[in-house]
A protein has these predicted regions:
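Non-catalytic structural scaffold of enzyme domains
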Residues: 1-189
């Protein structure tokens, strides 16, 4: 396991600096490859803004969160799904990979959701204010916009949306789906 700095990642994502982030991923992957890894996963949803470019240069196969989530959305049969995450993830409707489903981002509070997410991810804790922003946005997406489920398209949203605690609407935790795919890949070498 290797860690790409969150602040640098979010800055590269915000600025669309694909080349810089891919270089970080490549160097980390090469270091891990010397330790014997056979596959790599970028576990940050935000970090997938450059995943196609990274796959082209990665010395090992990439377990792609976007592919995993696309399959899970299809498996669950969603036609309209809401989205919470960073500004880029929401504005691009999950990087444009969900072509079989209508993806709805928060309409009036997209920037507020983004700012709450970045604040929470940077601090590593969720405050009551963060929770209120995400719960309000998720509720609006389901009740006002008719979304069948809310995609938790930010790795750190697990700080707010915890197992066994019903937020009042269905969720699809992208990080959880990705973690299951990573575990499956590890067990089926």
């Amino acid at each position: 396991m290797a860690h790409a700095d969150t602040r640098t990642l979010l800055q590269n994502q915000s600025e669309g600096n694909v080349e810089a982030q891919v270089d970080i991923y490549r160097r980390l992957t090469e270091r891990l490859q010397r330790s014997g890894i056979e596959r790599i996963a970028v576990t940050s949803v935000a970090g997938h803004f450059c995943i196609d470019a990274f796959r082209e240069v990665s010395p090992v196969p990439v377990i792609d969160l976007l592919d995993v989530v696309k399959l899970e959305v299809r498996r669950r049969g969603f036609k309209r799904i809401g989205l919470l995450g960073t500004r880029v993830v929401m504005e691009t409707r999950f990087y444009g990979v969900l072509d079989d489903v209508e993806v709805i981002a928060p309409v009036n509070d997209l920037l507020e959701v983004h700012e709450a997410y970045v604040s929470m991810a940077s601090a590593g804790i969720a405050t009551p204010g963060h929770r209120e922003v995400f719960m309000r946005a998720g509720s609006a997406l389901t009740s006002t916009h008719g979304c069948e489920s809310i995609m938790l398209a930010g790795t750190d949203l697990a700080l707010v949306f915890q197992k066994g605690v019903d937020p009042g609407f269905d969720t699809l935790d992208c990080a959880e789906a990705h973690a299951a795919a990573i575990a499956n890949a590890a067990m089926t070498r």
